[in-house]
């Protein structure tokens, strides 16, 4: 179930994925939808800053945050009942899942705000996951608590490159702090990553000699990479 939680990082449609082409590139003015006016016409409202609550791009972005987080919650609860897991494996997987849950919820917060989404963790029973649950509470502290647990529990280098590392968790914390506008708190974390961070393969982080290497399948997980996951075709 831990591996299953990673499925939340990829979605079957392109408009709600984590690379945020819609809510980052198009909304930010760096990209245009193109094509014909009746092709994904709801994207026009995003591009013209006229999004309403009926826009299904928003609905899917909302669902994706909880789709991913719930997979983490299910895995965490199953692990609590597992009798044949050693402490090291349990600690590592728990840290992985909390990293992923923080990432999923942060993706939602970037769109809906820190008081626009209820924080649902593994302690909340399924019958309590009602869409009417109070969502007026700032969930940044919850997200940051997950990130801190990930920083504490993740290793510097994983045995499998797609799993998050301590460097990845630190980078996520810095991104969250910057999203909150706390550049002063993020700066020393980023400086530490630059000086001591490791790539998924355990290399010292550094800029690639050729920028294209970051987007080339033959050089994936390179020295400029902090966290990336490869999926099978159709996954």
Enumerate the predicted regions with their spans.
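An aromatic- and glycine-enriched ligand-binding surface/loop that stacks and positions planar moieties
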Residues: 1-39, 117, 140, 144, ...
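Conserved, well-structured interaction surfaces
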Residues: 3-14, 36-111, 134-141, 147-161
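Generic, ordered loop/turn and secondary-structure boundary motif
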Residues: 44-52, 63, 112-113, 118-120, ...
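A broadly tuned preference for mixed-charge, low-complexity surface segments
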Residues: 56-57, 124, 156-157, 228-235
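Glycine-rich, histidine-containing beta strand-loop boundary motifs that form or position
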Residues: 101, 106-108, 121-123, 209, ...
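Short coil/turn linking the two alpha-helices of tandem helical-hairpin repeats
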Residues: 109-111, 116, 158, 179-182
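Short coil/linker segments at helix-helix boundaries
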Residues: 114-136
